Amino acid sequence: MAVLRLMLRVWIVLLFAGVGSVNAIQVEVAPGQVLQIHPSDAAIALDGQLNESIWTELDHYDEFVVIEPDTLIKPSHRTRVRLFYNDRGLFVGVEAEQPTTTLVARLSSRDNRQIKRDNIGLVLDTSGEGRYGYWFAVNLGDTLMDGTLLPEKQFSSDWDGAWEGASSTTSSGWSAELFIPWGIMSMPKQSGERRIGLYMERFVAYLDERWSWPALPDTVPRFISALQPIAVQDVTPKQQFSLFPSTAITRDRIDGETEYRLGADLFWRPSTNVQVTATVNPDFGIAESDDVIINLSATETFFPEKRLFFLEGQEVFTASPRADTRGGGVGNRGAPYTLVNTRRIGGKPRLPVLPGEGEIRVKDQIQPTDLLGAVKVTGQNGQIRYGFLAAFEDDPEFLVTDDAGTYRMVGEGSQYGAARLLLEDKPGGAYKSVGLLSTMVLHEAGDALVQSIDGHFLGANGKLKIDAQAFTSDKEGIERGYGGFIDFEYALKQGVTQRVGIEYFDEAVDVSDFGFIQRNDNFRIRQSHIRTRSDLDWARSNQFDFRGFVQKNAEGLFTQGGLFFSNRSLLNNLHELVFRLDLLAGAYDDLNSFGNGTYRVDPRAMASVGWASNRAKPLSFGGKLGYMGEELGGDSSVMSLFATWRPNDRLSVDAMLNYLNRKDWLLHSQGSTMGTYAAEQLAPGFGLEYFINAKQQLKLVVQWVGVKARSGSAYEIPDQPGDLMRRPDLDVSVRDFSVSQVSVQARYRWELAPLSDLFVVYTRQSNQAGLLLDRSFNEVFQDSYQAPVTDALVVKLRYRFGS
């Protein structure tokens, strides 16, 4: 017996002696278990190599399952996660096993989620109660991504934090280190034990699989309320203060002027639950150009915010999921509805009333308005979250030409304000909240005020979700308007979701001074049904999306309605196939006459098929073919091609070409006259991105959209809503025309430190419309390119100082 005890002791000693640095004890996590994270003041060199002794001392977790496709099986490779913290922040170390020949490392600009490459992601619910959170990711190659999260899974990339992440290849795959400072995140004020929700994610590019811990695929309703709870002790971040002085030099090659600008941004977090941000004399000339879009309709195109100051802390002003309709689903979610669209601030200027018959230079009509400054306060006090925003525009200048010559005229900038309060329920059970939002725009042409109330409900099991918002607008010279909507979403089972929405906007409601809705005078009912499956033999996954809506205006006229079918299949060879079919009913168009009456359009159909190769390969390509019916019965076709070449992790070349051939395209001509056109639209694009290293980027983007339209038939809008009346005698008034928009931007960016950059940006943009005069596409392009409305070189240095 003594011999057996001795042998047992020797076996135990040998067992633990054989545990190497990469084989620390693996901890199995029980359902609902709160993980106590290890505190340590160990020094870490953030290089992704996990070679500090602390990483060998910590237990590790490997609880990952496959969530995309949502098979929930154990992955084919191991992923070991280790965590520790101190009063500065949370440290995360990850070992990702896989064959080294399968690694996919591609550098890109920050927050580019479209590229398929190996990465490690992390979500933290710092509220500890499923109210709000932050997500972080480091890609193999050290490109970072981050953003914010609202219930239940409203992910946004519109936030950049001062955190660090790095990666490194190993003999068994790759590894990553992340350091998340407590001070960059909002957290409730509390002492003692602090609960935080944790979610880890890994994307394996060569398999096109996403793995996560805990198991939360997109096909289940819950996310932020179902994260893995972890506990840390006595985390009370110190007061955080950051000052970002900046200097910018802008050479305007059109006016031949050079502008020198000094400015500063301030980020101050006096406690864990309050943040103050301010900017003085900012320069946004280095912001990335918007996509080139030609829109000749009466509805506005929405462009997302790209300026860092307005992205920081913006989530508290999100009063509804409708505020951000960007998503990964195959269905078209439409334009957003939001009362706070910060792109209005510093956007196109309000044009002044001219004293006589003059004309304002096109450049001055579309140039962004300079800002004098802005301030924003966001925070939390118990169950209440709040936010306040104020911004002040400078007075814009306009070059006016009339019969007497050319002179300069000074307009007036606007002042913007927004206030937000959100009361959330206590943790446990269903999530309930109610919010108030008020906005104000002051301008000499008239002030605009908007007030709203919103409510949100999420069942305890995450299946039923309700979001509602009601608002009223008070605009000088217009009677008070009212509007609102309510959305219901129910998860029938895993992978099957049904949504129903009802909205009403009266004829007077107008939130466009600060917010964004595409139209008022509208009563609409809409629905969507989405099914996602991964238990298929012929494909990795398949998503079917069926949507439909009907709407009418205050006169009771049916203004639009249709059924929309979309299906996206990810095939077993990782190629993608997308089918779309839209069936639009005959309806009355009360917008595109631009206030000259209402007319009836025919029912029509649209269909397309698209294919794309495996985007994880060095060369990927695809295209689309489609058919589109016109409003008076014409037949149009669309074709697009695209390709991406990534010969290595530093270089990326993109090329695309869209071509649209329209027959009987119906457009407003003048007054009560509509015209049809035979039109061609050509839209080539080219992008080149080269990374000297992960911190230095060269980027060139060239986009052009050109339209050549030849006149067809003239129609008269009836006095009362009805069919358009053919008017051969007015054919001569319908003229051939062309439109050309060109955007060229070359950027050099050097990230000197987190959120500290040197930019050199050259931007040239053209926007020209006029008579076609039998010109070719090449001539249309050349004429507009030689007459730019923006031609500027900007050099900007911004550096972060502070704690």
Could you describe each region identified by the protein language model?
Residues 1-7:
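N-terminal secretory signal peptides that target proteins for export/translocation
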Residues 7-19:
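Bacterial N-terminal signal peptides
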Residues 24-422, 787:
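Structural preference for beta-rich elements and adjacent junctions enriched in aromatics
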Residues 88-90, 132, 174, 192-196, ...:
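Outer-envelope beta-barrel architecture signal
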Residues 181-191, 224-234, 251, 270-274, ...:
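Outer-membrane beta-barrel proteins
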Residues 236-277, 386, 416-474, 535-538, ...:
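Surface-exposed extracellular loop regions of Gram-negative outer-membrane beta-barrel proteins
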Residues 253-254, 265, 297, 365, ...:
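Alpha-helix capping and helix-loop boundary segments enriched in small/acidic/polar residues
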Residues 370, 465-803:
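Exposed, low-structure sequence patches enriched in small/polar residues
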